[in-house]
A protein has these predicted regions:
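A short, surface-exposed interaction/processing loop segment used at functional sites
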Residues: 3, 28-41
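A short, exposed loop/beta-hairpin motif centered on an aromatic-Gly-Thr core
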Residues: 14-32
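Short aromatic-glycine-(Arg/Gly/Cys) micro-motifs in beta-strand/loop hairpins
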Residues: 1-17
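Acidic surface patches and DE-rich sequence motifs
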Residues: 10, 20, 63
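Short, mixed-charge low-complexity intrinsically disordered segments
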Residues: 36-112
């Protein structure tokens, strides 16, 4: 499966960056906000530190924070999916996970 980074620009010049996989688009700003919420969430959550899912989330957050952005789309999408899997069934109040369905990909410039 190919993961694409999509850049869209409004007439006013505002630029948004998205991650696209299987025609689903996630805005990187929302991923950043979700990670921020997840960090706060994990600080007050009784996770078993030996739980592999907990370790996976911690590693993804660390990689994103330290700028290991080689393959940014893959890393961001993986982080997105892990967060959705972990948090969706026990989503704390105020934490929103958003994902967009791409409908008109041809209207967006796909960055190389």
């Amino acid at each position: 499966m190919q993961v694409q980074v999509i850049v869209s620009q409004t007439l006013e010049g505002e630029v948004s960056t998205y991650v696209c996989k299987n025609n689903h688009v996630a805005n990187l700003w929302y991923i950043d906000q979700t990670l921020e919420s997840a960090r706060e969430y994990l600080n007050g959550y009784e996770y078993d530190e030996h739980d592999p899912e907990f370790g996976k989330l911690q590693q993804l957050i660390e990689d994103l924070e330290t700028g290991h952005y080689d393959g940014v789309a893959r890393m961001a999408w993986d982080a997105w999916m892990v967060l959705c899997d972990i948090i969706k069934d026990d989503q704390p109040e105020g934490l929103e996970i958003e994902c967009y369905q791409a409908t008109v990909l041809e209207d967006w410039q796909v960055s190389k």
